[in-house]
């Protein structure tokens, strides 16, 4: 194996977020409020299964232990199960997860697990069906809930649920969410609303700090857990009376980036060192055949020298990210 990916600030990178499409069939207010608009990339322009196999092989050789498949909505790809299987070929990759809107969970989750999927994150921003539809533009609440149940039935011991925290939308519904996870092994992750190029007005109206929830959880006796090296950025809390857990993702905290352990590759094969940042490093010309792996690994390693110490969000810098479907959130 080549040397472990490490940047100039001695941060080690064990986690790859790999976008496989930017297409989504939901119209979430904080991501694609006007629905998906093609950016000139056709479905044939997204990374192929073979390209995904090569890029994940290179990252595995460089110490990656976890790959998360993102979008857009990853399950809209007809070859999604094949993609999972291709990533699974790498023995060094111990965890393969997906972030999904849950649209196809009920139908396909058992097949995904058989192909090698080990983790699921489902986006659910409200437990009220009408509010869910208002946020997502889709009347699919019951379908998504059935999908979460199907994930447990398929053998997943835990399901993570992502909830974007929004003032006057769901920030006051903590008790409802806590009741939901009391007897279910769900890690409910509240994610602070992030400002993007297309979402400034929404951010000003609905942003609220996760610190408010953290203070309330601590007041109620929830206990902060230690992170593992391939975990995402969530601060996770547990409580002896609950089967579920609470996670808080607060990107506006000053030291949020100090423990960064993840890199991103977009659906068209660009390496992004940060969700909010530069235009990306093209990898696609080195994904054409298996003989290029050494050069591919060298380019990835060299790019890491340019990774900045922080995303500067706390200094009101939103980078180039127009919306969160662009490189997989």
UniProtKB/Swiss-Prot annotation:
[4Fe-4S] cluster 1 binds at residues 24, 28, 31. Residues 8-234 form the Radical SAM core domain. [4Fe-4S] cluster 2 binds at residues 257, 260, 274. S-adenosyl-L-methionine binds at residues 30, 72, 123, 194. CDD domains: Radical_SAM, Twitch_MoaA. Keywords: 4Fe-4S, GTP-binding, Iron, Iron-sulfur, Lyase, Metal-binding, Molybdenum cofactor biosynthesis, Nucleotide-binding, S-adenosyl-L-methionine. Its EC number is 4.1.99.22. Binds 2 [4Fe-4S] clusters. Binds 1 [4Fe-4S] cluster coordinated with 3 cysteines and an exchangeable S-adenosyl-L-methionine and 1 [4Fe-4S] cluster coordinated with 3 cysteines and the GTP-derived substrate. GTP binds at residues 17, 68, 99, 160, 262-264. Its cofactor is [4Fe-4S] cluster. One of its GO terms (molecular function) is metal ion binding. It catalyses: GTP + AH2 + S-adenosyl-L-methionine = (8S)-3',8-cyclo-7,8-dihydroguanosine 5'-triphosphate + 5'-deoxyadenosine + L-methionine + A + H(+). GO terms for biological process: Mo-molybdopterin cofactor biosynthetic process. Catalyzes the cyclization of GTP to (8S)-3',8-cyclo-7,8-dihydroguanosine 5'-triphosphate. Belongs to the radical SAM superfamily. MoaA family. Monomer and homodimer. This is GTP 3',8-cyclase. It comes from Escherichia fergusonii (strain ATCC 35469 / DSM 13698 / CCUG 18766 / IAM 14443 / JCM 21226 / LMG 7866 / NBRC 102419 / NCTC 12128 / CDC 0568-73). The lineage of its organism: Bacteria, Pseudomonadati, Pseudomonadota, Gammaproteobacteria, Enterobacterales.
């Amino acid at each position: 194996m080549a040397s472990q990916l490490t940047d100039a600030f001695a941060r080690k990178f064990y986690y790859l977020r790999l976008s496989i499409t930017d297409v989504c069939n939901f119209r979430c207010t904080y991501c694609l409020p006007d629905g998906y608009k093609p950016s000139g990339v056709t479905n044939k322009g997204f990374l192929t299964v073979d390209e995904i196999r090569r890029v994940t092989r290179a990252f595995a050789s460089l110490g990656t232990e976890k790959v998360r498949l993102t979008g857009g909505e990853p399950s809209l790809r007809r070859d999604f199960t094949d993609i999972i299987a291709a990533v699974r070929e790498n023995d060094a990759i111990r965890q393969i997860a997906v972030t999904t809107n849950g649209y196809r969970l009920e139908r396909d989750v058992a097949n995904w697990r058989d192909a090698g999927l080990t983790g699921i994150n489902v986006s659910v921003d409200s437990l009220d069906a009408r509010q869910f539809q208002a946020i997502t533009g889709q009347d699919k609440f019951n379908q998504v809930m059935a999908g979460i149940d199907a994930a447990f039935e398929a053998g997943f011991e835990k399901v993570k649920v992502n909830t974007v925290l929004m003032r006057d939308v769901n920030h006051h519904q903590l008790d409802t969410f806590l009741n939901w996870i009391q007897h279910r092994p769900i890690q409910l992750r509240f994610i602070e609303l992030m400002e993007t190029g297309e979402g400034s007005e929404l951010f000003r109206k609905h942003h609220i700090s996760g610190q408010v929830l953290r203070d309330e959880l601590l007041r109620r006796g929830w206990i902060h857990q230690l992170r593992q090296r391939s975990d995402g950025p969530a601060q996770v809390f547990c409580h002896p009376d609950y089967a579920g857990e609470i996670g808080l993702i607060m990107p506006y905290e000053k030291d949020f980036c100090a423990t960064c352990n993840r890199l991103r590759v977009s659906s068209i094969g660009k390496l992004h060192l940060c969700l909010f940042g530069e235009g990306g490093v093209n990898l696609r010309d080195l994904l054409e055949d298996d003989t290029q792996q050494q050069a591919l690994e060298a380019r990835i390693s060299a790019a890491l020298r340019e990774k900045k110490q922080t995303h500067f969000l706390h200094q009101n810098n939103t980078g180039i990210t127009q919306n969160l479907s662009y490189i997989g959130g």
